[in-house]
Amino acid sequence: TGPDDGLNQAAGETVNHLLENGIRDMFLIPADIPLITEEEINSILKAHPSAPSLTIIPSRDKFGSNCILLSPPSRMTLKFGPNSYFRHLEIAQTNGLKVNPMEFPGFGLDIDEPKDLFELLKAEGNTRSQKYIRHLNLVKN
């Protein structure tokens, strides 16, 4: 078992719940992506191809999958973990999905290590996450 097993299990359970309720799309954003904007989300929704399809946004190092829009959700099994971005692209292509990779600066930073919190502090903007980290006063000026 690895640190991403919980996310993979939660994604699988979510797919089952969506199917049971007749929902045809799944928009998954991990909780550690603090800089996304409403405009980026709207752009993803507008650019998502008709089913069967995968729209995917990588982490800035292109190793992680920081956003997935999958239609229908049952068309592929998500496998988060090391190098998940390229693994998801391969799984989608193998399963005959239209693949729509996109990149957005707000989706680039994910909080995996302490150094990522410093990146968050240095980043432009004033998100709730940034305000909270500043409030904790972890870094002395």
What are the language-model segments listed below?
Residues 1-25, 84:
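Short phosphate-binding loop-to-helix
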Residues 5, 33-35:
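Acidic metal-phosphate-binding loop of nucleotide-sugar-dependent transferases
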Residues 23, 51-52, 97:
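Short, high-confidence coil segments that cap the C-terminus of an alpha-helix
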Residues 27-29:
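Short aromatic-hydrophobic micro-motifs that form the base-stacking/packing surface
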Residues 36-62:
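Conserved donor-nucleotide/metal-binding helix-loop-beta segment in metal-dependent transferases, i.e.
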Residues 56, 67-69:
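Conserved hydrophobic/aromatic beta-strand scaffold that supports enzyme active sites
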Residues 70-92:
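Short, glycine-/small-residue-rich phosphate/pyrophosphate-handling segment
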Residues 83, 90-141:
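Conserved alpha/beta core of the MobA/IspD/sugar-nucleotide pyrophosphorylase nucleotidyltransferase superfamily
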